Amino acid sequence: MSQVNMRDMLKAGVHFGHQTRYWNPKMGKYIFGARNKIHIINLEKTLPMFNDALSFVERLAQGKNKIMFVGTKRSAGKIVAEQAARCGSPYVDHRWLGGMLTNYKTIRASIKRLRDLETQAEDGTFAKLTKKEALMRSRDLEKLDRSLGGIKDMGGLPDALFVIDVDHERIAITEANKLGIPVIGVVDTNSSPEGVDYIIPGNDDAIRAIELYMTSMADAVIRGRNNVAGGTEVYAEEAAAPAAE
């Protein structure tokens, strides 16, 4: 099992939190101190928590479970899409649609519409339509793909969520909590860790930090899939550990 080390996190700037005036007291126990009015995250706390989260994801993947990657803010979206695609995991990189988990039946109908439009675009149906109708369907396809393209192959609810910036993705976390889906989240000094089962205290803005989180998580999924046990599968409810402190 490959693990992240302290040097990786320092190089990526994981330890840089937000300005001290924006801090959330619930993150106090993960803060080492402050420098130039910026909170410094205690990486001695982050390191084992990050590696625990990676181990959890690897166990889930080994049991053929699905981990959904969620990161819709500008600094995260591209990296989330790239790394999720690399490990064959579902992802949301543009905008979280309300009900994506709690109203999955409706979402599934939209995914079917997306697939139908993709088929029409490929089999020449669009070419047989009027220019106006073809344009309308092309726009519909583009819009649906941007919103749902990352989850069109999910085939059901995910077994866990990995979230970059828990404040920004609070709706996703609330939906997962309602359904009992475990949440792994990068939590910065200005955020609330509530509703997060596996907390990773760290910088949720720096691109290098986001790359480290996402690459490590994708690697964990790939390792798990490559080590699928012959007989024993680990299911989400069995692998889920108690909520982090």
Swiss-Prot record:
Could you tell me which InterPro entries the record lists for this protein?
Ribosomal_uS2 (IPR001865), Ribosomal_uS2_bac/mit/plastid (IPR005706), Ribosomal_uS2_CS (IPR018130), Ribosomal_uS2_flav_dom_sf (IPR023591)
Gene Ontology molecular-function annotations = structural constituent of ribosome
Q: Which controlled-vocabulary keywords does the entry list? A: Ribonucleoprotein, Ribosomal protein
Gene Ontology BP terms: translation
Q: Which Pfam families match?
A: Ribosomal_S2 (PF00318)
Q: Which residue ranges does UniProt annotate as crossing the membrane?
A: none
Among NCBIfam families, the record links this protein to: rpsB_bact
Q: Which family does it belong to?
A: Belongs to the universal ribosomal protein uS2 family.
What name appears for this protein in its UniProt entry?
Small ribosomal subunit protein uS2
Which species is this UniProt entry from? Pseudomonas putida (strain W619)
Underlying gene: rpsB
